[in-house]
Amino acid sequence: MSKNLKLFTVGNFEFRLQHLLIIGILSLAFSISMLIRSQGADYGFELNEFDPFFNYRATEFIVNNGLVEYFNWHDDRSWYPYGRNVSETSQVMLHATAATLYPIFGMGADLYDFTIMFPVVFGSLSVIVIFA
């Protein structure tokens, strides 16, 4: 069977067998990565380890205070006894992206639940980006 077999046409686009294979492979890869990434939910819908808790706290800070205040935030609850300047010592884009997408895709969910699902969805979407 030829991979260039024409299946049907939509407008000027000819849908071929190779397109169906690519869609199938990407769907399978997305599904498998979603299953692997969400295995932690088998033990409860909780944040595990210390980094996710800090990422949640930093995202919550941006949601409550705004991005400008985040760049001025000196966190005295970490790096005892002096604290730290968060914007200089952490992943700014991770926190900013989660805080920006929360009002859009949060669908009324709690921020805590959103920060649990955020890495699962974005990790699975990265499979498609890597394929491209």
Give short role names for the model-derived ranges:
Residues 33-34, 51, 83-84, 100, ...:
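Acidic, glycine-enriched active-site microenvironments
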Residues 44-58, 67-76, 86-97:
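Extracytoplasmic catalytic/substrate-binding loops of multi-pass membrane glycan-assembly enzymes
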